[in-house]
């Protein structure tokens, strides 16, 4: 759907801090694939992403706008989905511990706005994703998990759905962000 590219481009466009998906660097450095991840890996993802986002939000370079590539709700979504897949190493018991940590971190976060990309089109293989979960059915199931968690955590009222092509989504976020800056 182009989430990471969108976040990077928005950060550069507004000269604002933006985060990357911390888990991807962790996985590259650890030489571990999605299906090999266990509970300790997901706890590291949660803490690593939270700390990265927090450091960028609190950075002296932040003039009030920050774009996050990922957070605890996204990590929890993947963990829940992977824990239900017998081809993945993550167990339902490990997921229960991940869920507690993810929910604690979600409560600490106070997002002003959350943009959610809905699944559409063909998933582009970036050679860093578990392609067994890249079909439209799987991506829609992941989206529904995220949506349910956004509702359950009280964050759904902050959500704007991005369902256009890349440029339409970019312009939608730019328009919203300019409105915030002009206040």
Where are these regions (language model features)?
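Conserved substrate/cofactor phosphate-moiety recognition/catalytic segment
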Residues: 8, 12-51
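Anionic group-transfer/hydrolysis microenvironments
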Residues: 22, 71, 118-120
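Walker A/P-loop
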Residues: 3-4
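Charged, low-complexity C-terminal accessory regions
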Residues: 7, 155-183
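Glycine-rich phosphate-binding loop used to anchor ATP phosphates in small-molecule kinases
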Residues: 43-109
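Short aromatic-enriched loop/helix-cap "lid" or pocket-rim segments at secondary-structure transitions
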Residues: 29-32, 78-81, 126-128
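A glycine- and Lys/Arg-enriched "phosphate-lid" helix/loop adjacent to the NTP-binding pocket
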Residues: 82-168
